[in-house]
Amino acid sequence: MDNNFKIKDLPKNERPQERLIRYGAEVLSNSELLAVILRTGTKNQNIMMLASSLIKETGGLDQLFNQSIEELTKIKGIGVTKAVQILALSELSKRFKTYKSGNEYKINTPLDVSNLVMEDMKYLKQEKLKILILNTKNIVKYIRDVFIGTLNSSIVHPREIFCEAIKKNGASIIICHNHPSGDPTPSKEDINITLRLKECGKLIGIDLLDHIIIGENKYVSMKEKGTI
């Protein structure tokens, strides 16, 4: 059983839900906010203890929100239901961070790209390649994952990249991929892929504006490095 201790079993002045109602969500700690979402503890831990240990065990909210359902359910006290709640909360937080009024996100600098994809990519355990398709005003109209796995120029085919841009009537594209090591320093393959896509873009009239490599809370822009 994983529902022996509930929020209502805590003293009223210690219940995070009561504190939120009385004082506002901003006064609650991360553990308290997580406790409000998860609601129930375990046989040996009340919900506050469980929420606190969960954040500590995973290394903080960033790491917690990048766990897979398999990883979460290996943690003592976390079943499928709680894992699903955490994953849903994680996805909402990522979407909110990239939300813009009117659902428009304009790219002016490489930092704008990083802000858009960092939360989703910085802790991935495999390399993932994303394509951002922009209109003539540099507003992101479409984002798609086009490849997962070790990137090299023989696998990443320009046809797959630019086919999406053509379908969506894109004026230009930006590609992003992550380095699971956390170090965004470009490899020779990264540079080769960038140059190949740049030349293909020129031929078909859809410019490659940048190639952003994501590390752990840092990034490298091929445009800033002069590769593009």
Swiss-Prot record:
tRNA processing keyword on record: no
Lineage: Bacteria, Bacillati, Bacillota, Clostridia, Eubacteriales
GO molecular function, one term: metallopeptidase activity
Domain MPN residues, every copy: 106-228
SUPFAM superfamilies according to UniProt: JAB1/MPN domain, RuvA domain 2-like
Alphabetized UniProt keyword annotations: Hydrolase, Metal-binding, Metalloprotease, Protease, Zinc
Family that this chain belongs to: Belongs to the UPF0758 family.
Keyword Nucleotide-binding appears in the UniProt entry: no
Residues spanning the signal sequence: none
Motif (JAMM motif): 177-190
Protein name per the record: UPF0758 protein CLI_3057
One biological process term in Gene Ontology: proteolysis
Residues holding Zn(2+): 177, 179, 190
PANTHER family referenced in this protein's UniProt entry, alphabetically: DNA REPAIR PROTEIN RADC, UPF0758 PROTEIN YEES-RELATED
